[in-house]
Amino acid sequence: LILVKQTIHFFNKEQIKSLLYHAKSKLNKSGKLLIFSLKTKNNQIPCFKQMKIKLKKSLKNDELLFRIIKIRLINSKESYFNFKVNITKKKYIEMIKKRYISCLLNMPIKSLSTGINELNSKYKMNIKFTDTLKCISYKKN
């Protein structure tokens, strides 16, 4: 089993091609390759304005990478996993401060603070949403 979880967006096209080539060659006869990433359309992750812009841009890039993956992994299957999330606003804001999602990694502290204020006014004590992961599975023949 080779598992790639929510990291494909850190790679460029050539790196993805190389990763897939090496992963396929290292798989055992009955091995599986699983690639997980955020669902790229209709994502429900609670965002502040600037975070949403960065997330959309990142997910658009993921779409391109998924096309490359589907071409390279012939006969792969695509599925989705839904996770019902119920989190306190306080805990979610702590996660934002720690930049839990990669679109926040290079965001200036001032923008992050503005976004946190936006989330504080937008949400009540609890935040509920469905987090959906896309999974591409490939089995070596």
Regions found by a protein language model. Give the residues of each.
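A conserved beta-strand element that flanks and buttresses the S-adenosyl-L-methionine
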Residues: 3
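Conserved class I S-adenosyl-L-methionine
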Residues: 32-62
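Short catalytic micro-motifs in class I SAM-dependent methyltransferases
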Residues: 6-7
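Non-membrane alpha-helical structural segments and their capping/turn regions in soluble enzymes
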Residues: 13-17, 113
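Conserved Class I S-adenosyl-L-methionine
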Residues: 76-141
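A short glycine-rich, Lys/Arg-flanked "PGG" loop and its adjoining helix->strand segment in the class I
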Residues: 17-32
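Active-site capping/gating segments
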Residues: 55-77
